[in-house]
Amino acid sequence: MVDVQTQRKQIEKLISLNRVTKVVKGGRRFSFAAFMVVGDGEGHVGWGFGKANDASDAIKKSLTSARKNLRFVSIRKGTLPHEVIGCFKKAKVLIKPATHGTGVIAGGPVRAVMEALGVHDILSKSLGSNNSMNVVKATFKAFDLVLNAEKVAEMRGKTLKTLWG
């Protein structure tokens, strides 16, 4: 899908689509819950969750939620600049940069996030909980810890030129 405002192609990945049941006096009422990841393949990625009585409506709601939740992650040469560990509840995600040609070595939800983000080479390990929503949230917590060269130079009180030599 092409985003009309920025003319960027968006990558949409469905993480999970669950049929949930509510038991009422007259019987069971079914609805759907969708969890999606959206990215542009150039460093912007977001997740969204939507619930509706129809599966397609739940997916649409999760897409709009994901587009509102887009954030930028610094990518360098098709991978992250350094190793990070993200934790959310009991889910822990370890993400390591990899050399060119390694590919995306990651489990289900983390793989979908990395593909939507535009990362081509990464090593990842999901530890603890395997709940897909918590694993994705732990991945996004890890993205909050990623530092780019400008942030490192600013923290050290140096310019980029003196930092890189």
UniProtKB/Swiss-Prot annotation:
Domain S5 DRBM: 10-73
Keywords assigned: Ribonucleoprotein, Ribosomal protein, RNA-binding, rRNA-binding
Pfam families: Ribosomal_S5, Ribosomal_S5_C
Biological processes annotated in GO: translation
GO CC, any one term: small ribosomal subunit
Molecular-function GO term, any one: structural constituent of ribosome
Domain of life: Bacteria
HAMAP family in alphabetical order: Ribosomal_uS5_B
Subunit structure: Part of the 30S ribosomal subunit. Contacts proteins S4 and S8.
Domain text: The N-terminal domain interacts with the head of the 30S subunit; the C-terminal domain interacts with the body and contacts protein S4. The interaction surface between S4 and S5 is involved in control of translational fidelity.
Role according to the record: With S4 and S12 plays an important role in translational accuracy.
PANTHER family assigned to the protein according to its UniProt record, in alphabetical order: MITOCHONDRIAL RIBOSOMAL PROTEIN S5
Similarity comment text for this entry: Belongs to the universal ribosomal protein uS5 family.
Name of the protein described by the UniProt record: Small ribosomal subunit protein uS5
Native source organism of the sequence: Borreliella afzelii (strain PKo) (Borrelia afzelii)
Lineage start: Bacteria, Pseudomonadati, Spirochaetota, Spirochaetia, Spirochaetales
